[in-house]
């Protein structure tokens, strides 16, 4: 994909918090031949003004309606959940939409966004940066050659994000209007009630399931959609979760996330095993820059000898590559590799994982 073969995309950024300051705005500035950022938006006036000044953005606003009235092609939504209303407004205003994960809480929200996207004819892309990592793409090619996958596991040991953010210049403001905070709480609660219906009260203690989003979209991209949630356990005061998934070929996947806040050592792996091959990805935290995802491949060659290899990984960021892919989708009509339609499957799986915990029984899909 040649950087200068397509027109520049004018994109507005909604949400000026940590992920915007650490990843999206620095990356958009580096991609100045491909993107222009004429406006940012945050409900915190101080946050919006600071980020606009720091990243040399000409204009800042506190109301997304003012942003959507501006001369922009697309919006990048990375503000605090929920993002559904903002996404729908953007589509209705004729803008392409990049929306950070998870895209929403309920299937009803996902369907509303997808409907607005289709009516607008615009691109809707989920912020699934891990599938754009060069190491992930290399791993996918290896996995596609595996005949009979037996076992899969993802392990996600998550320290406090504050440990990672301490190495970056991230500024926060406490001028958020109380009414905005109350509206967010009510909208989030309504979405959870929509997602879980009669199980809503019990689902209130299961929010960590949404923290599996990186693991789940990576699994879906690599292996497809599971046929069942066999079981789910949540423990340690809702800071740890393990769920077992079943795939159509009978393979099992064990997905675990544990919040271990104090020790600064982020661990996240995706491991795929068959009789003759093993593929293991090791990811860095999303709050890092210029840190590569690592790939290990083990197998048996044509001579019957075992091999172990760690391929050299190109120095490309998944965060940057997903933005370039968005531009390609906008300019050339390329189907998105992380479309809102695909992202809906991930929300459905999170809901089923939660239901398996609440009911203490399998959920067949």
Language-model features and meaning:
Residues 55-116:
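Beta-loop-alpha module in the N-terminal Rossmann-like domain of NAD(P)-dependent dehydrogenases
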Residues 105-181:
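A contiguous active-site-proximal alpha/beta segment in oxidoreductase catalytic domains
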């Amino acid at each position: 994909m040649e950087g200068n073969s397509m027109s520049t995309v004018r994109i507005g950024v909604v949400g000026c918090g940590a992920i915007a300051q650490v990843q999206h705005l620095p990356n958009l500035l580096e991609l100045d031949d491909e993107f222009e950022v004429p406006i940012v938006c945050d409900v915190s006036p101080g946050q919006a003004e600071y980020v606009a000044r720091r990243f040399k953005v000409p204009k800042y606003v506190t109301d997304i309606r003012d942003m959507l009235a501006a001369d922009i092609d697309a919006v990048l939504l990375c503000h605090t959940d929920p993002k559904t209303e903002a996404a729908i407004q953007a589509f209705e205003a004729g803008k392409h939409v990049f929306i950070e994960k998870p895209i929403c809480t309920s299937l009803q929200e996902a369907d509303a966004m997808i409907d607005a996207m289709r009516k607008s004819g615009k691109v809707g892309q989920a912020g699934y940066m891990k599938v754009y990592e060069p190491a992930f793409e290399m791993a996918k090619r290896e996995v596609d050659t595996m005949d009979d996958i037996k076992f899969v596991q993802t392990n996600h040991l998550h320290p406090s994000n504050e440990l990672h953010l301490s190495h970056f210049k991230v500024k926060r403001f406490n001028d958020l209007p109380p009414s905005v905070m109350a509206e967010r709480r009510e909208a989030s609660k309504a979405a959870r009630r929509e997602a879980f219906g009669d199980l809503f009260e019990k689902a209130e203690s299961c929010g960590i399931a949404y923290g599996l989003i990186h693991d789940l979209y990576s699994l879906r991209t690599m292996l497809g959609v599971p046929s069942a949630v066999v079981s789910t356990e949540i423990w340690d005061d809702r800071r740890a979760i393990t769920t077992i998934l079943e795939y159509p070929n009978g393979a099992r996947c064990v997905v675990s996330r544990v919040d271990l806040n104090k020790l600064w050592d982020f661990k996240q792996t995706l491991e795929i095993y068959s009789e003759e091959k093993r593929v293991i990805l090791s990811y860095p935290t999303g709050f890092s820059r210029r840190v590569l995802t690592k790939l290990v491949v083990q197998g048996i060659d044509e001579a019957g000898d075992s091999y172990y290899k760690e391929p050299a990984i190109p120095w490309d960021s998944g965060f940057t590559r997903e933005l370039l892919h968005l531009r390609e989708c906008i300019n050339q009509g390329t189907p998105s590799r992380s479309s809102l339609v695909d992202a809906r499957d991930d929300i459905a799986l999170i809901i089923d994982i939660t239901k398996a915990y609440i009911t203490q029984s399998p959920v067949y899909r």
